[in-house]
């Protein structure tokens, strides 16, 4: 591949060439399309589900598609994309396949005739987005020398913000241009449909731009780069034999986790508990069985190199900083998932005074939520330009805790602003939190991890993004049903009460930051 200069040689090490700005833009532009897909999903799926007959209590369960597919697809795609090579290279085949599937899912989603079709399409959409997105993070490491990687990730952040803003305002803009935001019962409004159509086309073209303008290094080229370039073919990426837990560790914890999951599920059954709790119980049982299966693999060969043993082994031997940061990330994403599920019904109730998903007022609220998310993403994108400099002055740990508290204040602000324009103000705090969550935890983590384990630990760190979403999806509905008549009326209704749960979760995350040890603040 031709960079802005050819490879340079220092001693026995051949270094990657630096790329020029236009090449970095080309390799990052696909993220613009990917974020259009995510933003259309986050801003409109609750609205689509409710239009097709879903009630408030089932929304978290229906939203489980995202975290579950992320938990499954991200490690699989990352693992196999490392081993792929073909005419399009290593990562680009996944960009292409994912973009095609995502575009088809975006075209189908607003035309779903039944709730079960929309729910199934969401599973396909989320899986496809993960196939497309996951290799993009590794793409920066593949293509750029070490000193250009911050620029590469910053460029991705810019395109994340730009794509999210445009997709978020699309339904509002189409309605302003005369495309109706009202439809018959059970039919998705035309302004939402056209947002998905245009968004799907934009996603496909953006990803194709990266696929066809960026040529990857061949395996023999990558093998020439030294360790300082994080040689992806280096065979030292797994955990050391001395660190790998013995078979008895996995069998003991496998039995404990499986038994706890089974006991939890049995308690739900015999107490006639809400069926959504079975999601949590079933997930624990599945994790326990994975531990037991891995116990057999490790017993036969403790040094065996396989996907499951490497992931579970490194999961149990995470560095101390990563363990503490995982707690912060967990509660941060609990709050974010609550925001995505409940913002539309909360805004409809607070500013438009309606809970009727088929009403014109509710559709107006749904359009306005797109504007709110656009403000949030715009603030996050702008904040990303200066957040590194601020962190150097006040300390990364203190800044991230402050940003999370700003996000918590944003959640609380939903209760203090009753007009649609007033509700834009809380999105400033939530935008600061969102920009911080996208950047600072990864900066802290990168400083704490050995380079040879960076990839697998980053993948494991993503578990603490999807696991809280599964927890919210499996428990939030039953919790809100329990509080619907007793507590929720005191706070303006179920969705506004749920928003306060998001504020509390951000506060817990900010408190947990005090236990994270960070060099240079």
What residues fall within each predicted segment?
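C-terminal ends and interior cores of transmembrane alpha-helices
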Residues: 95-114, 405-418
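Helix-loop boundary and gating motifs at the non-cytosolic
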Residues: 9-69, 323-328, 332-357
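Intracellular loop-helix junctions on the cytosolic face of multi-pass helical membrane proteins
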Residues: 1-21, 113-116, 132, 146-331, ...
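C-terminal transmembrane helical hairpin of 12-TM major facilitator-type secondary transporters
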Residues: 397-440
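Hydrophobic core of transmembrane alpha-helices in multi-pass small-molecule transporters
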Residues: 105-109, 113-132, 422-436
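Loop-to-transmembrane helix entry/capping segments in MFS-fold secondary transporters
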Residues: 56-57, 146-156, 366, 449-461
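Intracellular juxtamembrane helix-capping segments at the cytosolic ends
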Residues: 131-144, 436-450
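Helix-to-loop junctions at the C-terminal end of transmembrane segments
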Residues: 72-88, 382-396, 480
